[in-house]
Amino acid sequence: MDLASLRAQQIELASSVIREDRLDKDPPDLIAGADVGFEQGGEVTRAAMVLLKYPSLELVEYKVARIATTMPYIPGFLSFREYPALLAAWEMLSQKPDLVFVDGHGISHPRRLGVASHFGLLVDVPTIGVAKKRLCGKFEPLPSEPGALAPLMDKGEQLAWVWRSKARCNPLFIATGHRVSVDSALAWVQRCMKGYRLPEPTRWADAVASERPAFVSYTANQP
């Protein structure tokens, strides 16, 4: 595995990320959520993609793609492992969203190219990274109450907002993926909350990918 070449690709791709608002439709009609996981000891990559109407946040479509994993897990290079399955799920959608929430990092990455940014560049769609853990940067400790907020900083640059979406839950790291500013990324995530830790697009993507009870009951109630 030529990590030097992958690192150079990351730096080059990151320079093409648009960090300001360039939504084709604002507000969007459809918002997607995307989540990637692995099966069979990592040999299979599974990507779930859901489509929600906005502003109702009603689930209207979901697709799951499974492909052979193309590279091993290497910290800092996860997007190269995840994007092929995301592209496969993207191609399965009957209609394309105006905005995509990706479970993972956007520019809040050591070389400013997390999976939300990488995928956004590949399909040229506005994306937001919604991550559950910090990958780089520093932030001031958050108060315990919901709504607590702090910038994630690295080398004098704001990479994300650290936001406690729910009491007694760890905060989310919300970042520009592509064609969405960091402040708008936070605002869109906040508009898509329904009382859970995760915003509805990535909550549903996770539920579909992992066949959680919410998704099982949803499918049982479909005609």
UniProtKB/Swiss-Prot annotation:
The record marks Y73 as: Interaction with target DNA. Its cofactor is Mg(2+). Its EC number is 3.1.21.7. It catalyses: Endonucleolytic cleavage at apurinic or apyrimidinic sites to products with a 5'-phosphate. It comes from the Bacteria. Mg(2+) binds at D35, D103. One of its GO terms (molecular function) is single-stranded RNA binding. Its main location: cytoplasm. One of its GO terms (biological process) is DNA repair. It is an enzyme of class 3 (hydrolase). It is found in: Cytoplasm. Keywords: Cytoplasm, DNA damage, DNA repair, Endonuclease, Hydrolase, Magnesium, Metal-binding, Nuclease. DNA repair enzyme involved in the repair of deaminated bases. Selectively cleaves double-stranded DNA at the second phosphodiester bond 3' to a deoxyinosine leaving behind the intact lesion on the nicked DNA. HAMAP family: Endonuclease_5 (MF_00801). Belongs to the endonuclease V family. This is Endonuclease V. It comes from Shigella dysenteriae serotype 1 (strain Sd197). The lineage of its organism: Bacteria, Pseudomonadati, Pseudomonadota, Gammaproteobacteria, Enterobacterales.
